[in-house]
Amino acid sequence: MSEDQKSENSVPSKVNMVNRTDILTTIKSLSWLDLMLPFTIILSIIIAVIISVYVPSSRHTFDAEGHPNLMGVSIPLTVGMIVMMIPPICKVSWESIHKYFYRSYIRKQLALSLFLNWVIGPLLMTALAWMALFDYKEYRQGIIMIGVARCIAMVLIWNQIAGGDNDLCVVLVITNSLLQMVLYAPLQIFYCYVISHDHLNTSNRVLFEEVAKSVGVFLGIPLGIGIIIRLGSLTIAGKSNYEKYILRFISPWAMIGFHYTLFVIFISRGYQFIHEIGSAILCFVPLVLYFFIAWFLTFALMRYLSISRSDTQRECSCDQELLLKRVWGRKSCEASFSITMTQCFTMASNNFELSLAIAISLYGNNSKQAIAATFGPLLEVPILLILAIVARILKPYYIWNNRN
């Protein structure tokens, strides 16, 4: 057997060994709290539903009617909704945003990401929601609202695990955070009512004002608090102490606030949820399809956009091709793995905290829209963990441009 054949035959075994190691590394990259998140969400829902069914007096404890409220949401629930959004915002490097825009590749990737996140993403989720929930208007609206809410912070975790470009990811997260203040209201009305031809109980102008106010309160308040906490803490304590002590204290409150919010919702709605569990579970279909389609569509697009259009350069001639015989993508070897991963996970992720907060504010904590919005994080964490593992598995099978 020739040396080339020996080298070629050794590639699969090496790749398989790398894959097994990468899978374990990917899983270990998450904290045990992150890994337990799907189970703790399910446990919170089960306990709340049991309380709702067997303690009927609990169902109206958190209703806005007859209690102090903000934007139609009871104060106890409002506190939970705001608390769960502050920690992700505190993790974003707001103080460094001006440095990144000087890099030409970031400006180019930002334009592509805006198109994927604000045009393709909501369209894809709307199409999938209609496909699976054609006869379930309220659940469909809740799923569409998840699609309109683009991810602002959780993607930082997935990007780091998959080996994405951290600088690019920070720019995309900050840009999406600011754009959501402006775009969420018109897009929610457009996809939930205008193109869906769903009946409006009020005028377009009044509905727009309600959605815009809800976004201003339930994104604006935590956004402002999060930025003040980060910038103030960095000034007083320094970056090292902030990340070592302050951020470590703040981070768990995102999931504490989220689980508390889930608990309240299912106490209010749990008894009805049991009777409609079949139609509610249908919400899983568009969400699961969205995560996988969005991720692999972006992966394929990033490879396609890197294909050389020159007649004289049809295939890769870099050193990697000489070393790896059995690889794919020789014509698209200009693709960067780190940039591709950042685009894939930014496209596949959603801001489930915002969609849940707005659903509660607009339709009430006992609405089907709010129930549908709770399924986002239940599915997003395990599926994106799977996709992070898939990214590690796919990497050795493709040639990548590592110059960045």
Swiss-Prot record:
Residues 1-34, 91-113, 163-169, 238-245, 302-343, 391-404 are cytoplasmic. Glycans are attached at residues 201, 365. Changing residue 353 to A: Impairs arsenite resistance. Changing residue 318 to A: Results in moderate reduction of arsenite transport capacities and sorting perturbations. It comes from the Eukaryota. Pfam families: SBF. Keywords: Antiport, Arsenical resistance, Cell membrane, Glycoprotein, Ion transport, Membrane, Transmembrane, Transmembrane helix, Transport. InterPro entries: Arsenical-R_Acr3 (IPR004706), BilAc:Na_symport/Acr3 (IPR002657), Na+/solute_symporter_sf (IPR038770). Changing residue 151 to V: Leads to complete loss of metalloid transport function. Belongs to the arsenical resistance-3 (ACR3) (TC 2.A.59) family. This is Arsenical-resistance protein 3. The lineage of its organism: Eukaryota, Fungi, Dikarya, Ascomycota, Saccharomycotina.
